[in-house]
Amino acid sequence: MDNILNVSVILPLKTSTPKDFDEYFKKAINSLLEQKTKINELVIVHTDEEHLVHFLNSFDFGELNVSKYVWVDTPNFAKQVNFGIQNAKSEWVSVFEFDDEYSSIWFKNVKKYVDIYPDISAFLPIVVDVDEKGQFAGFTNEATFASNFTQEIGYLNHDTLHSFQNFQTSGMVFKKSLIESFGGFKSNFKLTFVYEFLLRLTYNSVRIMTIPKIGYKHINLREGSIFWNYKFGNEILSENEVKFWIDSAKKEFFFADDRQINYEPQL
C-alpha cells in the first residue's frame, strides 16, 4: 500500500514503575497511531516484570501490528534494541522510547526521502528536546545544517562526529541490514553507545541524512532514565569517566563486535 512504510519500530521496556509511565506510554503509542504514513510493525522487547506484562497484555494498541518478546536476561537498553532489530520483519527499523513521541508526518517524510535518495541508508529527524514539564529545552541533530560543523549540509559524516557528539538515534530510521553488516549497539558502553554506533556507521561510509523537519519529541533527562542516572542518580559518572567513554568510542568504532570495556578510576 502507498501509505505504509516498510519499517519496524523497536520499543525496549525495562519496567512500568517510572512516574507517569501509563501516560507517557499512551502518548507514545498514539503518536504511532496518528502517523500519516503507517508503519509495518511495532516490536516490543520487554522484561517479565509482572505489572509490565499485565499492562502490555491489557493495553489497546488499536490497528498497530504488534510483536511482543519477553527479555529474560538482565535488562539492558542496547541488548534489547539489538534483539528487537534481529526479530524485525521489515527492511527499515527505528528505535523508540516509551516517553517519546513521533511527529505525525515523520514516517511520511521518510518514505518520500527513501524514494528520492535511494543511496541513503539512514535518516535522522530533527529532535525537539523538552523537560518533564513539556517545556522546550533545545534541538538535537540540527548540527548537520551548521556550516561550521560540516561541509556537506544535511549529512552526518565521520569528521563532524569527531568535532561534535550530540546526536540522537532514537527516532532515526535506518536499514536493518546495517546491523547485520556492521554490528548493533554495544551494551558494554556507558554513556556513549549511541555516539560509538554513529562513528562506526560513518567510518564504514554509511550515508546518513537529516530530514529538515521536526520528526521526534524527546524528554531530556527524565528522572530515572539512563542518562539521568549517569548525571543525578545512583550511577553518577565523574568527569574523568565521561571523558573515558568518549575516548573509548573514538577507539572502538573500528570493531563491529561488542568488546569488553572497563573504566578504572584514577587514584
Model-based region annotation:
Residues 72-88:
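Glycine-rich, basic loop-to-helix element that forms the pyrophosphate-binding segment
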Residues 27-39:
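Short, acidic, metal-binding catalytic loop of nucleotide-sugar glycosyltransferases
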Residues 142-164:
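Short, flexible, basic/aromatic active-site loop/helix in glycosyltransferases
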Residues 190-197:
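Acidic donor-binding loop at a coil-to-helix junction in glycosyltransferase catalytic cores
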Residues 105-139:
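Conserved donor NDP-sugar-binding/catalytic core segment of glycosyltransferases
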Residues 93:
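Short aromatic/hydrophobic "clamp" motif used to bind/position activated sugar donors
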